[in-house]
Curated annotation (Swiss-Prot):
Domain of life: Eukaryota
Subunit-structure text: Homodimer and heterodimer with TSO2. Heterotetramer of two R1 and two R2 chains. A radical transfer pathway may occur between Tyr-125 of protein R2 and R1. Homodimer contains a dinuclear non-heme iron center and a stable tyrosyl radical essential for activity. A transfer pathway may occur between Tyr-125 of protein R2 and R1. Interacts with CSN7.
Binding site for Fe cation 2: E118, E180, E214, H217
Annotated control of activity: Inhibited by phenol, paracetamol, 2,4,6-trimethylphenol, resveratrol, furfuryl mercaptan, 2-thiophenthiol, phenylhydrazine, and hydroxyurea.
Chemical reaction(s) catalysed: a 2'-deoxyribonucleoside 5'-diphosphate + [thioredoxin]-disulfide + H2O = a ribonucleoside 5'-diphosphate + [thioredoxin]-dithiol
Naturally occurring in which organism (per UniProt): Arabidopsis thaliana
Gene: RNR2A
Designated name of the protein: Ribonucleoside-diphosphate reductase small chain A
Function summary: Provides the precursors necessary for DNA synthesis. Catalyzes the biosynthesis of deoxyribonucleotides from the corresponding ribonucleotides.
Gene Ontology molecular function: metal ion binding; ribonucleoside-diphosphate reductase activity, thioredoxin disulfide as acceptor
Length: 341
């Protein structure tokens, strides 16, 4: 997969040395005083959303798995294989690059907590594969999906290339906003389709928790980007987003078609474009696809339904009192999921 050394050894691009987020701080080893209240609030939201794999009951899923069609089993197992690998890739980017790039303690605190959550996500997906897949050779193939499954290898290579890239923090930040905001969107949506059908309650509950975590991680990337003094030319943002849309569409509509579980591939393609438009707007760009959300049931869950996420969660998702000190907190940055851009 290549070495990280070439990316880590790069010099700062012109203008980066003057970026407050990236400048070495004398007080970077102590948390207070907080310089960016909006970043601190995002960290406290992440802290309030902690959960563990032990909270997810898979007993019903084990019974329902046997009743699924071969096509449904194929689709779900490959989606889980992608997720199990991708969380490790995101974790490596955080540990090897972003924690070295960013010098603000409250931003590092968020990344540190995100690393913990990515580990839990990876554990959850691995546990799902371990629970559902009994054949040892098939299990080994799925656990090594980056090497053994071409459509997953292509997505992984795009991510790994950005980890190793010598390009600016701003470029890599947008790329990984796409990883968490676009690369996961089709797969999340497909699993929520199973929830709509009343299938696999443990899988779909864990998907809800993880998709909301990833939505927050994507929001955080957009927040940091909004705080950069030198942002990218719009054309560069569009280029990165378009690449991500093409790869995700090919993955979930062609290579691992969602019609295996009864979904319409054309509507899934439209949904991915809708998600991309929303990300573009959050990054300060204009919508490029002009796509509407074709799945009205996604309004209440996942990326589109986060407005009440930290106030209301099935199963007591928010840890008690963690957010109490932020009720009247900073309002400098607020991500909305309204469709009217």
């Amino acid at each position: 997969m290549g070495s990280l050394k070439e990316g880590q050894g790069r010099d700062m691009e012109e203008g980066e040395s003057e970026e407050p987020l990236l400048m070495a701080q004398n007080q970077r080893f102590t948390m207070f005083p907080i310089r960016y209240k909006s970043i601190w609030e995002m960290y406290k939201k992440a802290e309030a959303s902690f959960w563990t794999a032990e909270e997810v009951d898979l007993s019903t899923d084990v019974q329902q798995w046997e009743a699924l069609t071969d096509s449904e089993k194929h689709f779900i197992s490959h989606i889980l294989a992608f997720f199990a690998a991708s969380d490790g890739i995101v974790l490596e980017n955080l540990a090897a690059r972003f924690l070295n790039d960013v010098q603000v303690p409250e931003a590092r605190a968020f990344y540190g907590f995100q690393i913990a959550m990515e580990n839990i996500h990876s554990e959850m997906y691995s546990l799902l594969l371990e629970t559902f897949i009994k054949d040892s050779k098939e299990k080994d193939r799925l656990f090594n999906a980056i090497e053994t499954i071409p459509c997953i290898s292509k997505k992984a290579k795009w991510c790994l290339d950005w980890i190793q890239s010598p390009m600016s923090f701003a470029v890599r930040l947008v790329a990984f906003a796409c990883v968490e905001g676009i690369f996961f969107s089709g797969s999340f949506c497909a699993i929520f389709w199973l929830k709509k059908r009343g299938l696999m309650p443990g899988l779909t509950f864990s998907n809800e928790l993880i998709s909301r975590d990833e939505g927050l991680h994507c929001d955080f990337a957009c927040l940091l980007y909004s705080l950069l003094q030198k942002q990218l030319p719009l054309e560069k943002v569009y280029q990165i987003v378009h690449e991500a849309v093409e790869i995700e569409t090919e993955f979930v509509c062609k290579a691992l078609p969602c019609d295996l579980i009864g979904m319409n591939s054309n509507l899934m393609s439209q949904y991915i474009q809708f998600v991309a438009d929303r990300l573009l707007v959050t990054l300060g760009c204009e919508r490029t696809y002009k796509a509407e959300n074709p799945f009205d049931w996604m309004e209440f869950i996942s990326l589109q339904g986060k407005t009440n996420f930290f106030e209301k969660r099935v199963g007591e998702y928010q840890k008690a009192s963690v957010m109490s000190n932020l009720q009247n907190g900073n309002q400098n940055y607020e991500f909305t999921t309204e469709e009217d851009f």
